[in-house]
C-alpha cells in the first residue's frame, strides 16, 4: 500500500474529524516525532469557513504552492507524512487550492478519525474564535455578514443572523453551538461518510491521543519496513 507519484512511494496518515476536536493540537504533538505537512500553518489560515480571522494573513496561491511542495519533497525522504485532511481548498472568504496529492481522500493510506465530547468541541471553538477586544468583535461580526451573502437558503441566512445577534450579546458559547450545528456539522458528516477509519481516537487529552496515534503510526511503519 502507499501512494505512487514521480516513481516514488509515500504513505500518508490522514487526520479527519470535526472542527474543534483538537486535530491541530494533536498534529503539533506528532510533529515532535514524525514528518508532518501542516496545511493550515503553510497557508497561514485555519481549515474552516472562519479560517482567516483576526491576526491570520493568508498566503497567496503562488507562495502556498511553493511552500507546500517543498514540504512534500521533505516528507518523501522519510517515505511517509502525517496530514490533517482539509479537503480541496482551505481558507475563509478567499480560498487556496490544495495540491491533488493532499486534496484527494484516495491518496490517504491510513485514515484516523478524531472525535471528542461535545462540550470539549464547543469550548475549543469558543477559545479559537472568541474576540479579545471590540475591534476583533467587529471583525467577527463582519465575517458573518460577508458569509451571509454566500447563502441562498432562508434557514442558513436566519442561522447566520442568529449567530450575529448572539455575538453582539457576548453569548459566545451559544454562538459556537449554532456555528457547529449549522455551519460545520454537514461539512464534517460529508467527509466522514467518504472514509472508513483505520483508527478512531476519542480525544479528551491531546497528549494521550497523540500517543495512541504515534503508536499506530509506528506499528504501520514497521509493517511497511520503514522503521
UniProtKB/Swiss-Prot annotation:
One of its GO terms (molecular function) is tRNA 2-selenouridine synthase activity. The keyword ATP-binding applies. The keyword ATP-binding applies. Gene3D superfamilies: P-loop containing nucleotide triphosphate hydrolases (3.40.50.300). ATP binds at residues 17-24. Keywords: ATP-binding, Nucleotide-binding. One of its GO terms (biological process) is tRNA wobble uridine modification. It comes from the Archaea. InterPro entries: Arch_SelU_Cterm (IPR030815), P-loop_NTPase (IPR027417), SelU (IPR017582). This is Uncharacterized protein MJ0053. It comes from Methanocaldococcus jannaschii (strain ATCC 43067 / DSM 2661 / JAL-1 / JCM 10045 / NBRC 100440) (Methanococcus jannaschii). The lineage of its organism: Archaea, Methanobacteriati, Methanobacteriota, Methanomada group, Methanococci.
